[in-house]
Amino acid sequence: MTQTFEIAVIGATGTVGETLVQILEELDFPVGTLYLLAGNNSAGASVPFRGKNVRVKEVDEFDFSKAQLAFFAAGPAVTLSFAPRATAAGCSVIDLSGALPATQAPHVVPEANAHVLEGLKKPFQLGSPSPSATNLAVVLAPLRGLLDIQRVNVTASLAMSAQGREAVSELARQTAELLNMRPLEPKFFDRQVAFNLLAQVGTPDAQGHTALEKRLVHELRAVLELPLLKISATCVQAPVFFGDSLTVSLQLGAAVDLATVSRALDAAPGIELVDEGDFPTAVGDAVGQDVVYVGRVRAGVDDPAELNLWLTSDNVRKGAALNAVQLAQLLIKGLA
């Protein structure tokens, strides 16, 4: 008889939480009891799972000793409040919010550093990195031993869904207002986002860097196990509902062999290489898929030691929910 596990999902009514529940069902994860949890504003709602509607309960009232593993798919404040309570009750934690530092909750991407999970003692705390860091790690993992990567420059064009349903609704509303020639009234954002790009996502610090940009840098170094890697990151808000797209430039220690790079990417897990003059897009390729699409693989215009890439993926699915569930799949033997 197949062993099952008691699973809790915190933030179950959010975009990532709902997708995570969907993936648990799609991958036939051995769930015994599924506890769906959220704040009091969402408690009482229902989320479908295996042909039934599972009622969402208030996280503040949950006894974490009932669960063996909890996915934290809500905001950082929720993780900081309830993750310690979960582990104190013997429940292991996978955090998708970025609230827990890598020294406390190792950040793991299965395609890049799955070995970190070996010998992990329960109850454990793990971090599933931000979608940008996760998907960039998937692509750089097969290249880090092949190339002398000295610097990574990345510009991440982020989808609205990264900021939740309110941001998605704001883009839809602004688009409708503009197409119908009605006055635009920004609400969630402080300015127009429809048919526009915003140069920053979040409030910058005194040095001009946003929390998302710093999170991308720290998590990518941790996952690739290259603590001294120089990384420059810029996150911009793009007017798309789902699917992040990243422009990546790698400064190398020697001239790049594009054929070798393409072979490595084509053979790597979690990657779909699009070449021969074509290129992938978030809407046309990535949304709803379980891989990172890579295209426009090329050397620098006048620098043979520069490698440029374009990559796109479903930020909610591949970049967040799927990564967390794949971690759980690797860990369930240790949860018994």
Where are the language model's segments positioned?
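N-terminal Rossmann-like NAD(P) cofactor-binding subdomain of oxidoreductases
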Residues: 2-191, 228-230, 292-293, 297-303, ...
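Charged docking surfaces used in two-component/phosphorelay signaling
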Residues: 5, 70, 160-336
